[in-house]
Amino acid sequence: MAEIHTPYSSLKKLLSLLNGFVAVSGIILVGLGIGGKCGGASLTNVLGLSSAYLLHVGNLCLVMGCITVLLGCAGWYGATKESRGTLLFCILSMVIVLIMEVTAATVVLLFFPIVGDVALEHTFVTLRKNYRGYNEPDDYSTQWNLVMEKLKCCGVNNYTDFSGSSFEMTTGHTYPRSCCKSIGSVSCDGRDVSPNVIHQKGCFHKLLKITKTQSFTLSGSSLGAAVIQRWGSRYVAQAGLELLA
């Protein structure tokens, strides 16, 4: 026998659909958090603590995303079982999650301008102190070699950053092999600094641009998820009250 469609049954289906939107926004946040953690980890190795906030925001998005997915599932259960307590719990919890998401996005947008000022000096000093060379196994040197090769740059400001550094004192070279345009060429000897041999520009501004992109992606996506959740939770509350009245 076909199911009789009544306003009551339609309201239950609407509640289930709205909670599905809430769960989808949570999945978006989980993906965003994973991406933020992966990208933030690499940047933190190079830029240091000045970019560590990306990791923290990524962790926060991951946690909030998992909570939102659970709330969406709980809301769906509350709608199908007509549980007033479950629906009220989900609605109140979503309000808290929304506040956290908006706060996280605001912190990222406000904090980013400070990163450039703090990161430049910190990254410069750390590079001169901790960078060891092209084939060195330590994580710091490995990450910097990868950055210089992929971004086609040399040092923080330029190749002169290695002058007087621990790297030069240890190897006697003016720049590492990863600064060369062609790593296997004979002219890449650590002394020839001509534009045909090594990259003349530093990596800092390129790294800062990547950090800016990731920061705005995190904040924008977090606000986007918050809009979806705000819309969903609003109608969940209205429909839930009508259903359980």
UniProtKB/Swiss-Prot annotation:
Keywords tagged on the record: Membrane, Transmembrane, Transmembrane helix
Record's bilayer topology term: Multi-pass membrane protein
InterPro entries: Tetraspanin/Peripherin, Tetraspanin_animals, Tetraspanin_EC2_sf
Keyword Transmembrane helix among UniProt keywords: yes
Entries under Gene3D superfamilies matching the protein: Tetraspanin
Cytoplasmic compartment residues: 1-13, 59, 116-245
Tissue expression profile of the protein: Broadly expressed in most human tissues and cell lines including neural and bone marrow derived tissues.
TM regions (residue ranges): 14-34, 38-58, 60-80, 95-115
Signal peptide residues on this chain, from the entry's feature table: none
Residue intervals on the Extracellular side: 35-37, 81-94
Any one of the GO CC terms: plasma membrane
Entry's family note: Belongs to the tetraspanin (TM4SF) family.
Name of the molecule in the record: Tetraspanin-16
Organism in which the protein naturally occurs: Homo sapiens
The organism's taxonomic lineage, starting at the top: Eukaryota, Metazoa, Chordata, Craniata, Vertebrata
